[in-house]
Amino acid sequence: MPNDEQDKSGAVAPPPLIYLGTLVFGLLINKRFPTAFLPRTIARRLGWPLLSAGVLLLGWFEWTIRHAGTTDSPYEPVSHIVTEGPFHYTRNPAYLSMTMIYTAIATLANAFWAIVLLPVAPLVTQRGVIEREEQYLEGKFGEEYLSYKARVRRWI
């Protein structure tokens, strides 16, 4: 059994920081070089429902994790695999919700440059967080995690 220092995924950065940093950078570029990409009415009609769905998914994720009695931190040991709630549909509901929220905010701000940078956050999260988490979970839970991984998609 690994000690507590070894019993974690080794994520490169906290995912909320990855998303927030990328979004803020995109919004700052857009402030310097203003570029809208949608009519305001369409931006609102797309952005608000997407923001609502992202926040609801994030809340469902948090409730499920707390109810299951494990952690959502990539820097703490995971006690068991959670397969209920949003984890029945995606292995990464928190990161999916962060992607939805980022997209919604960038859309509501009508910030073209934030949308252009959007792929950076999920890509960095996948390479620097998700792939490390998956390796950690495979090592810690073996066949149980591999079976779950075979049944449920990484994103959607």
Identify the role of each PLM range:
Residues 1-84, 96-156:
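Membrane-anchoring alpha-helices and their flanking helix-loop junctions
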Residues 87:
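Solvent-exposed interhelical
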Residues 92:
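Extended, alpha-helix-rich binding/interface surfaces that flank or overlap catalytic cores
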